[in-house]
């Protein structure tokens, strides 16, 4: 199997215990990365620096990229992509959990010639035994493209990507909460090929605050601007824009309790219970 880089961005509000757990998952993989590109997006806490120092000494494959100020996830990952040595990139977030065979499974698939390979994901609240849902996604490229006309068709944190294809599409841009969806659309329009493994290979940790954060007028305003951008790019039809905007207006402005129920419906979640 080919060498690959793991791409991680971290900022000051990350939980050092969860970060340690995520790194342990990486180093427990059946296939190991040749490089970990860790982007420090602005100054971190002493606790986070301590974890980085400990693991980088134990595993000398870290390439640390330092942003003097917090640039946001999109621009942080943009710098990480440019710094990566290898063409195959494996995304990973700092608070998530993965099974031991994730890298091996996705690496084998991307070596078949795909540009982006992701998978299903399991959403859990705070701790792994508190599963909220399992999020399924279509397997094949044409169905993935169809879903992209409604919402992001790929679990971003679980994605394997080809650096060359990412850069050809313009690399990551600053699109708060839409960094991934924006990139996937541009990659699709450049002819990149997508695949989703039909297995949950990624456990996404969330909190009540994160679930409630994606709501309100400010969030909705940014979201509608990004959807209009997809229309102006020629990816969305006018019908796509009207339908997707209408759904989001309702979802972002409703009470939090109702939003969780709609969240599972709109974003294709299947209850894990």
Residue ranges: model-predicted function:
Residues 67-84, 105:
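Glycine-rich, basic loop-to-helix element that forms the pyrophosphate-binding segment
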Residues 40-49, 69, 93:
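A conserved acidic beta->alpha catalytic loop
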């Amino acid at each position: 199997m080919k060498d690959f880089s793991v791409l991680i961005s971290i900022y000051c509000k990350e939980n050092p215990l969860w970060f340690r757990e995520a790194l342990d998952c990486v180093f427990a993989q059946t296939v190991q990365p040749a490089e970990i590109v860790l982007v420090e997006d602005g100054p971190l806490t002493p606790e986070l620096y301590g974890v980085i120092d400990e693991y980088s000494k134990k595993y000398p494959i870290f390439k640390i990229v330092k942003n003097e100020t917090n640039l946001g996830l999109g621009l942080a990952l943009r710098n990480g992509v440019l710094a990566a040595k290898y063409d195959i990139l494996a995304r990973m977030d700092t608070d998530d959990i993965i099974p031991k065979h994730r890298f091996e499974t996705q690496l084998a698939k991307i070596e078949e010639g795909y540009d982006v390979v992701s998978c299903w994901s399991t959403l859990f609240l705070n701790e792994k035994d508190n599963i909220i849902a399992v999020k399924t996604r279509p397997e094949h490229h044409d169905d993935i493209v169809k879903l992209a006309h409604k919402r992001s068709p790929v679990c971003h944190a679980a994605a394997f990507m080809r650096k060359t294809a990412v850069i050809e599409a313009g690399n990551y841009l600053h699109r708060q909460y839409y960094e991934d969806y924006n990139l996937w659309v541009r990659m699709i329009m450049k002819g990149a090929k997508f695949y989703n493994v039909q297995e949950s290979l990624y456990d996404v940790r969330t909190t009540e605050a994160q679930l409630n954060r994606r709501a309100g007028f400010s969030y909705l305003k940014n979201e509608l601007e990004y959807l209009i951008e997809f229309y102006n790019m020629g990816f969305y039809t006018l019908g796509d824009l009207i339908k997707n905007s209408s759904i989001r207006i309702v979802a972002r402005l409703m009470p939090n309790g109702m939003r969780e129920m709609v969240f599972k419906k709109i974003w294709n979640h299947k209850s894990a219970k």
